[in-house]
Amino acid sequence: MVQEIAQEIIRSARKKGAQDIYFVPKLDAYELHMRVGDERCKIGSYDFEKFAAVISHFKFVAGMNVGEKRRSQLGSCDYAYDQKMSSLRLSTVGDYRGHESLVIRLLHDEEQDLHFWFQDIDELGKQYRQRGLYLFAGPVGSGKTTLMHELAKSIFKGQQVMSIEDPVEIKQDDMLQLQLNEAIGLTYENLIKLSLRHRPDLLIIGEIRDSETVRAVVRASLTGATVFSTIHAKSIRGVYERLLELGVSEEELAVVLQGVCYQRLIGGGGIVDFANKDYQEHQPTSWNEQIDQLLKDGHITSLQAETEKISYS
């Protein structure tokens, strides 16, 4: 019974195209939420004991400590349902009452269709011809990883492409993919050093998380390889400011940074803002014009348009 409920949750999430599933404890029930794109919606409220058992089921499959309900835990697994396998990442923590919450990240390990409202992949690819560092920013589920892989296939076909990810999200037979495992010393820093010995034409680094990672990314870019990576920021100018916060100098950025792409999924499609110079002074004119066009064409509401526009005060 518990396994059937768990499988139905994963089945439903996959059908909806959800990125995350949330089990939220209340006083005497569990609420189930799913996030699709930028929207998080409540699916329903369910029996507390039954859904606590569902959480324990997922934890067991992911190799987590089922008896520990207060301390935070992380886990991952390939979950079987309908003769399919779904890659999951799990995170749990208990509240002050000892009631456990669970977030499941669904990894879409097959490439998703990436539809842009106003851009074409081939046109975007023309921006990535110079060697150096290219950064992709945007919220979770905005298609950053998919876009990086699409560009890798179109620009670097037949060349040496490597990726360093945590975890590997899109499995590719035509590139060498490395996965972090800090328990055995496979950190971003060490894997970047290792990958450079293979002299890749393109190195994809899953995410810039801290100053140590960004230093390694900059060093890799200085070797002459082309490097793709993602970073958390809310605009192109925000990417530049974030790099400075992490300790990269303006002089280094002038040498290695070849382009910044900011993207979001809005109204069922993606929109992109790209810059290859003057990042700190970049104006979101193109971005806001795209938002206005989506509003005019009826794809988003006026409230969504105001929310999605970028302004610098």
What is the predicted role of each segment?
Residues M1-S313:
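Short, flexible helix-loop junctions that flank or precede catalytic/ligand sites
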